[in-house]
From Swiss-Prot:
Annotated protein name in UniProt: Putative DEAD-box RNA helicase HEL64
PANTHER family: ATP-DEPENDENT RNA HELICASE DBP3
UniProt xrefs under SMART domains: DEXDc (SM00487), HELICc (SM00490)
Stored Gene3D superfamilies: P-loop containing nucleotide triphosphate hydrolases
Organism: Trypanosoma brucei brucei
Protein origin, superkingdom: Eukaryota
InterPro entries: DEAD/DEAH_box_helicase_dom, Helicase_ATP-bd, Helicase_C-like, P-loop_NTPase, RNA-helicase_DEAD-box_CS
Keywords linked to the UniProt accession: ATP-binding, Helicase, Hydrolase, Nucleotide-binding, Nucleus, RNA-binding
Domain named Helicase C-terminal: residues: 335-483
Domain Helicase ATP-binding: 133-307
Positions of ATP binding: 146-153
Chain's gene name: HEL64
Amino acid sequence: MEETYSPFTGRQGQYNQGYNGGGRRDSRGGMGERIKPVDWGNVSLVPGNWKVLDGKAIKKAGEIKTSTPEAGQLSEEEATKWREEHVITIFGDDCPPPMSSFDHLCGIVPPYLLKKLTAQNFTAPTPVQAQSWPVLLSGRDLVGVAKTGSGKTLGFMVPALAHIAVQEPLRSGDGPMVVVLAPTRELAQQIEEETKKVIPGDVYCGCVYGGAPKGPQLGLLRRGVHILVATPGRLIDFLDIKRINLHRVTYLVLDEADRMLDMGFEPQVRKICGQIRPDRQTVMFSATWPREIQRLAAEFQKQWIRISVGSTELQANKDVTQRFILTQEFAKQDELRKLMQEHREERVLVFCKMKRTADELERQLRRWGYDAMAIHGDKEQRQREFILARFRKDPRLCLVATDVAARGLDIKQLETVINYDFPMQIDDYVHRIGRTGRAGGEGRCVYLITKKEAQITPSVLKELIGILERAQQEIPDWMIEWNAQQPRYQVKRNRGMNGFGRHQSAPFLRNGHRPSFSANGNYSAHGNGTFGLGKHNDDAVPFSSSAIQYKRFDSDDEAEPSRKKYAR
């Protein structure tokens, strides 16, 4: 046991140092069993200031109908027209007009911030930035729903820096003023990197994440930061051992909130929010707007405004040309070799589902004479950072990645994405596409798909056709045929029924001679129940998990999957 000093309690404590300084928990962190609820009525809090820009002043400036930048914001009529042109939908009352020009920030944000933005050759704010800035600068909570590569990082970070400028200075032992939660360490590092491009020398930004030694990260927190970017698991670890307090946090950001919930971080996020003062300003950004995110927003935010850039339906970037190659599993490597030859002069990212597949493709690409490296969850953090840094700098390097790199990573000038495996979830499909065609650029996305992959995930195939239609992409004839051959019934995966339409106290439907429940809820002692299924014909496949898994299409000419028997 190592004796360490806590800068917040002033007491000596014991800290169990694990592998690589990671402590006893993995990168997901524990559940914070030792974190106690805060009685905010008995806590002395530093007063916060959330209204950088008065909302009434914004509306008043919007009424001035002149085109000069000094006039401030757009008029109500101009704002409505601008939102229609950029397909922005507003949900909420008293939403301020967008800031369609950097000139609208004059006199509102610190002067250094405008200089930093113009130094990066930005000509105008992106649509999500233009609408989110006035909302956040007026102190309102925000939910932003926008596709990847739309400039969301600066969408919440520019108001955060203006927010810091009007707060009381940090004192020794204070925690951060701004906390940004990200689902993956790669995204957390990217947010930190983008933030450091626009902060001055007297504002400090730090990043803590799992998979890296805790010692340097604890030293960073001990010195003090204004902005902390963190993954939920690692922040829970530090809260659990009382190495950080969040009482000075007045601005909280949940980036890629849908991804955090998909990865099972909801308990950690709830614990962290419980340690942050209730009068905070809360910002959520997400690529989708599922029911879980709606529930989270209603719970964590007050009088919030939701802005949606584009359709609320899941959609792919229209700037990316999508191409599908129908193949068989044994021929995938041959198709990959042809694609690599076709895109030899471009930066290429290859996605696959399995870690062992990524390592195998890395070796195969090197045998073919390509410089290739693989990145996945089994790689150490320093290896992943090295590979990503080299991929950004070297256009000749081919990167093979699992879905750990599918969201949030911003690779400049990535022309081509090749999907070696078809994803199991439609969200992963869209976010793989989002790695190319960023910031208004064009890109190409190629999918190698087999009939077996499409049959295992028939619901994904149906959603895929809808995404292709909304992105104005060509739909292959065979995809339309497969979708038409799908069974007309669907399994209703009700909660409390283990997802297979059975009561928890009832036995599984393993064959036609086991008791089951019918669609109208009647108990059957002889099986053949159709609970969870719509009405079907006499020649339809009886309900069972194996019947659905091995359902065959009329056009399927592949062999039936072999079932191997293993000795017990």
